[in-house]
Amino acid sequence: MVFWDTSALLKLYVAEPDSNAFAMLAKRGGALAISVWTTHEILCGLHRKELLRDLKRGGSEAIYERFLLQITAGTLHVISYTTRVAEHTTEVIRRCYSARKPVAIRTLDALQLGSAFGGGADEVVSTDARIRAAAKILNLRISPDFPF
C-alpha cells in the first residue's frame, strides 16, 4: 500500500510546478492511502493557499468538496485512528528519537507515519523533509525519489 502525506496529496489538487510528477505517481494504481488527520490538514493547506491568493476566493472549499467526494468514491482510502495506529505512532516516535541520526519528528507527522504503518503501507509519498527522514529510519520506500 502507498501512503500519501498531505504535502504530496495537496499537489494533486492545486497546480504547482511539480504537480504533474505527482499525478503520474498517483496513477500507478490502487486507492491512495491517507490518514484521518489528512482530512483536516488538507483543509488547512487549501485555506492557506486561498489566503495567499494561490487559489481564487471560495476555491479552497470547492476543492475540499472534490476531495471528500474522492473519499466517498474510494479513490482515497482513509486510515482511521485505532489502537493499532496509536501503537505504531509510539513506535515511530521512539525509533525517530533513538536513531543514530535522530529525527525530531513532530506529533502530527508521527501520527501520519503511525497511520501508514497501521494501514500496512510499505511506501510513503511526501515532500516533507522530516517525514522523508523518518520514513528512511522506518525502512519505508520514499517517493518521489528526486530531492526537495
Language-model segments: residues:
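Acidic catalytic patch
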Residues: 72-100, 108-110
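Short, well-structured N-terminal submotif of metal-dependent ribonuclease cores
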Residues: 1-63, 129, 138-143
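An acidic intrinsically disordered interaction segment
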Residues: 1-14, 70-85
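Short beta-strand scaffold positions
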Residues: 33-34, 80, 107, 126
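Short active-site oxyanion
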Residues: 29-32, 75-77, 118-123
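Helix-adjacent hinge/juxtasegments
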Residues: 52-82
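Acidic, PIN/NYN-like endoribonuclease modules and their adjacent C-terminal/linker elements
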Residues: 1, 101, 113-148
